[in-house]
Amino acid sequence: MSLTIDDYKFSIALANAGLTVGQAAERAGMSRQRFYMIVNSKRATAQAVGRVAKALGVDVTEIIETN
């Protein structure tokens, strides 16, 4: 299963968490480069998106695209 992170929702969650991308990546336990790859990916794994959401302190449903 692949998911897409919504850019706007991600930006809001990042701002609400008061984190920089680097800080969020560190919380997710990955490099900034890998973190950016996941955030900008059109097809990220559910596990990867889950790590991003956890780093931001939100539920996955709060940052993914919905159609």
Predicted regions and their residues:
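A short, Lys/Arg-rich alpha-helix, primarily the initiator
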Residues: 1-23
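Residues in the recognition helix of alpha-helical DNA-binding motifs
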Residues: 13, 27, 38, 66
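Alpha-helical residues within the helix-turn-helix
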Residues: 15, 26, 54
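Short alpha-helical DNA-recognition segment
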Residues: 18-37
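Key DNA-contacting residues within the recognition helix of helix-turn-helix
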Residues: 36-37, 50, 64
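Short, basic-rich loop-to-helix N-cap that marks the start of a DNA-contacting helix
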Residues: 41-54
